[in-house]
């Protein structure tokens, strides 16, 4: 037998023996380290010739490949995490999305979303791209999301990070964790004020206002509503001399329905939100708010 053939047989024999030395315990250990499936772990260990670090790299590469192949998939499920600082001056909403409700309700997925949001809260990060470069478990959050995508086979994304600041920031998350609200008040440090803030947050969740007050509405929206009002008046056969007046009346109705402070309070329609807040504490009002819904 020639030396080349002998060497080839020697290498084949030792390679096969090495692969056979990958035990179920090894596979389970890698699974515990990475959370990947048993077969994926076995294949990665075999490809890495039993090297755990290399196997982890292989699995992460697989995750990146899966993520890339799913880049065009819709991620319309997930959770909203709402957090506020201890002094109630800073709040955030983190929207972490997936593809199915099954994954969205998974405890591990929820824990990952909360961990990501907590990093943003602890460092007062208000920019999504900055947050994605923060580290979690030795890798960036962006890499962690890719890794988790590979693990579960669904596209996982940090879709939005929204923050507000104020004297008293109150948060609300709807029971299904798919809708979150932040309200920034101009007063804080009072149980009554906090309770009122919670009521306002629930109002925002239910009524979805477009702005805090009339002056905060986008001018293009106002222009559109006036034109709609005029067209409706003309279609109803109203005289041209009163078309403008009718349109302005419809605009005021738009403000009542769609601006937070002018909306009727859902718990007591006899007052609007501005009046309700003023009853709780003289001069109490809303500085800003944020509303985030999964997939919206």
Region locations from a protein language model:
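N-terminal amphipathic/hydrophobic targeting modules at extreme N-termini
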Residues: 1-9
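Short hydrophobic targeting helices and cationic amphipathic motifs
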Residues: 9-11, 18
